[in-house]
C-alpha cells in the first residue's frame, strides 16, 4: 500500500433513532453516524416482521392459477 493516501481510521459512535448506540471504526471525519434503523429495532432482527399481502394479490393469484407444488407441470 502507498503511504499517506488512505484516510484516517478512527473510532466512530453510531446512534440509532430508537436510542441504541454502539462504537465501531470508520473513516468518517466527524466520528458520529446517525442511523434510522439498527439491529435493535429492525423488524428482521427483532422477529416482528410481517408479510403484507396488498389487496389479496397472492390469494387472487392462487385462486386463478391454483396452488401448484414445486416441480409439478401441467
Swiss-Prot record:
Its cofactor is Zn(2+). GO terms for biological process: translation. InterPro entries: Ribosomal_bL28/bL31-like_sf (IPR034704), Ribosomal_bL31 (IPR002150), Ribosomal_bL31_A (IPR027491), Ribosomal_bL31_sf (IPR042105). The gene is rpmE. Belongs to the bacterial ribosomal protein bL31 family. Type A subfamily. Induction: Induced in response to the thiol oxidant diamide, suggesting it is part of a disulfide stress response system. Oxidation of L31 may cause ribosome stalling, which would decrease the protein synthesis rate, allowing the bacteria to concentrate on stress survival. GO terms for cellular component: ribonucleoprotein complex; ribosome. It comes from Streptomyces coelicolor (strain ATCC BAA-471 / A3(2) / M145). Zn(2+) binds at residues 16, 18, 38, 41. Part of the 50S ribosomal subunit. Transmembrane segments: none annotated. The keyword rRNA-binding applies. One of its GO terms (molecular function) is metal ion binding. This is Large ribosomal subunit protein bL31. It holds the Pfam family Ribosomal_L31. Keywords: Metal-binding, Ribonucleoprotein, Ribosomal protein, RNA-binding, rRNA-binding, Zinc. Binds the 23S rRNA. Binds 1 zinc ion per subunit.
Amino acid at each position: 500500500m502507498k503511504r499517506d493516501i488512505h484516510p484516517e481510521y478512527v473510532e466512530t459512535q453510531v446512534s440509532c433513532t430508537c436510542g441504541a448506540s454502539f462504537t465501531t471504526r470508520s473513516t468518517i471525519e466527524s466520528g458520529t453516524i446517525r442511523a434510522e434503523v439498527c439491529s435493535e429495532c429492525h423488524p428482521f432482527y427483532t422477529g416482528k416482521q410481517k408479510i403484507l399481502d396488498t389487496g389479496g394479490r397472492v390469494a387472487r393469484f392462487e385462486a386463478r392459477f391454483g396452488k401448484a407444488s414445486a416441480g409439478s407441470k401441467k
